[in-house]
Every structure is written in C-alpha cells, then in structure tokens.
Regions:
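Basic/aromatic-rich interaction segments and small domains that mediate binding to polyanionic partners
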Residues: 154, 160-190
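Short amphipathic alpha-helical segments that mediate assembly, nucleic-acid/protein binding
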Residues: 17-20, 32-33, 59, 104-108, ...
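Intrinsically disordered, low-complexity regulatory segments enriched in Ser/Thr/Pro
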Residues: 48-100, 173-178
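Short alpha-helix capping/helix-loop boundary micro-motifs
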Residues: 128-133
Length: 223
C-alpha cells in the first residue's frame, strides 16, 4: 500500500495522530474483531499491537501466529507518517512484511503472539527491534569502544570515545570525546550498536568543552 494523505487536515497534533492510529487498528467484520492494545510513536513512526478475536468466541487459527490462551492472536504493525503541506499522511504495513523501521519498544513486543516460523520476516523484524533496544544508553564518563571505527564529517575516524555532554538552550545534550584527539562529536544511537564499555568515571560536563565554548554563544554545539 502507498501513502494516504488526509487533505482535510484534521490530523494536526500528537493526540490526533494517536486517535487516528487507534481508529485504523479498531474494526470489525462479520467474523472477526480487531482492537488496538498499544501504540507507540518513535520519531515519525508509529508502532502498534493489534489483537484479533473471533466474533463467535471461537479460537483464532492463523498460519503465522500461535493462538494465545484466550483464543486470540496479536500482531505488530508499523505506520510511517509525515506531513506534506500541512496534510498528515501514513503508510502502513504488518510485521509480516519485515518493515525496515524497527524501533518498536520491548513493552509492545511483549504483547505480540508467538510466531510459528522462526525464519519469517516478522521474526527477523522483532529481533531487529530487540537489537535496537539493547544498544546501551551510556552515562557521563563512560569510556566506550565502538564495534567498528566511525568516519566523521572531516574524514577522520574514531573508535574509542568517552561520553560527556554540552548544554544548549539550558538542556544537557549527549556528545562524545574522541580519545585520540580530544575532539567532541555527536554519534547516532545506531553507531553504538555492539559497542563495549571499557571503563566508567562519573563527572561533570567536560572541562575541555567548557573552555571551548567560553568565548562562544551559549547555543553553540559540536558539529
């Protein structure tokens, strides 16, 4: 399915989006009923867990899912969303399609029914979500070895960094100090996948960073 945009512009806020995701995941046919159990937004993507039951109360039989104890099955769905000229739009797909977007939280995955085929696209998608959730959230002073060298915008590379932070608009923001040069860089969460904690030394914001910004505006930041 392609993108569908709401040209009436009735979807404007987070609450509007969640209400629409709920509506899209809640419907009933002559034989089955679908109900949204949980929806989470990560970035611009919504992740949903939808439960299917039979209207007559019998057990739901499905070729892909193991039926739960209450006779239902619950599957995962992904909704890509974006705004185009003020109009909200979405593109949806079930987990069985193996969506590229794979940042569903573990609390949502826990609601999904067991899969029958361990080699299915859905199984691989769930594993990618778990791998994403397993990426460490490092703290101030943690010294880290990245799984592979990361190429920076100036063409140099780094692999051993220490977590620190800078302030912008009164808020703390994560950055990393490169071991070899002392340079401060920002790294995406995906670049931390498979990284290893070498040591931990808690501390305040980097004194190097404080000196670096001493003569600059408060809202300056690492590149």
């Amino acid at each position: 399915m392609g993108w569908l945009f709401y040209t009436d512009r009735r979807v404007k806020t987070y609450a509007d989006e969640k209400a629409e995701i709920t509506r899209l995941c809640t419907f009933e046919t002559d034989t089955r009923k679908t109900l949204l159990l949980k929806a989470c937004k990560v970035g611009s993507t919504w992740y949903a867990a939808a439960k299917i039951t039979n209207v007559d109360g019998s057990r739901v039989e499905d070729s892909a899912y193991v039926t739960d104890a209450d006779g239902s099955i619950t599957f995962g769905a992904v909704f890509l969303t974006r705004y185009d000229d003020g109009c909200w739009g979405y593109k949806d797909m079930e987990e069985s399609a193996g969506p590229v977007e794979s940042r569903a939280p573990l609390s949502l995955l826990a609601l999904l029914s067991e899969l029958k085929d361990p080699d299915s696209y859905a199984h691989a998608w769930r594993q990618r979500c778990r791998d994403w959730a397993a990426i460490p959230d490092y703290e101030e002073g943690d010294k880290i070895r990245l799984a592979a060298p990361v190429t920076l915008t100036d063409g140099s590379t780094c692999q051993i960094v220490t977590a620190t932070h800078y302030r912008r608009g009164g808020k703390k923001r994560r950055c990393y100090r490169v071991a070899e040069t002392g340079s401060l860089v920002r790294l995406s969460k995906s670049s931390l996948a498979g990284s290893q904690l070498l040591s931990s030394e808690k501390g305040e914001a980097s004194p190097i960073l404080a000196e670096f910004f001493a003569g600059r505006g408060a809202d300056d930041a690492p590149p």
